[in-house]
Swiss-Prot record:
Name this polypeptide is given: Protein-export protein SecB
Gene it is expressed from: secB
GO molecular function, one term: unfolded protein binding
Coiled coil: none
GO biological process terms on file: protein folding; protein tetramerization; protein transport
Length: 152
């Protein structure tokens, strides 16, 4: 029988979320109220997403910012345009620095994305439209695509 020593002072590697917040939020409803009468057809949604990572002054503290922009259009109108900058402050505790890029580009954005998604859904609904429910995002695939583009 083996014994596991649980009396160590060693802190296990983990990611701590210190804060989450809206940095910037803008919703434009440029064709209202005419656009609200044209909701019988499904609009075309153009969506863009970008991730910014900032190393904060303290060791192993990072700000990860999601920049999401969505524009909804139909044949006649731009229905709405929403822009959201949503960020989190993360502390990478006892994690090898070689793992930081993938954690900051994949795991941290995945942790805060559901909150950004909810904000966008609520705002678009409050503007008189069906809530914009952004599909889940594969941050791992985005990271690997970006890395392969940098290598070429």
């Amino acid at each position: 029988m083996s014994t596991i020593n649980t009396n160590t002072n060693e802190v296990m590697p983990h990611i701590s979320v210190n804060a989450q917040y809206i940095k910037d939020l803008s919703l434009e409803n440029p064709s209202a109220p005419s656009s609200l009468a044209a909701l019988d057809q499904r609009p075309q949604i153009d969506l863009s997403l970008d991730i910014n990572i900032t190393n904060l002054s303290e060791e192993n503290f990072y700000e990860v910012e999601l920049n999401i922009e969505a524009i909804a259009r139909n044949e006649k109108y731009t229905l709405f345009q929403i822009e959201l900058k949503y960020a989190g402050v993360f502390n990478l505790i006892n994690i090898d620095s070689e793992q930081h890029p993938i954690l900051l580009s994949v795991h941290c954005p995945a942790m805060i994305f559901p909150f950004a998604r909810k904000i966008i859904a609520s705002c678009t609904q409050d503007a008189g439209f069906q809530p914009l429910m952004i599909d889940p995002i594969d941050f791992g695939a985005l990271y690997h695509k970006k890395m392969s583009e940098h290598q070429n």
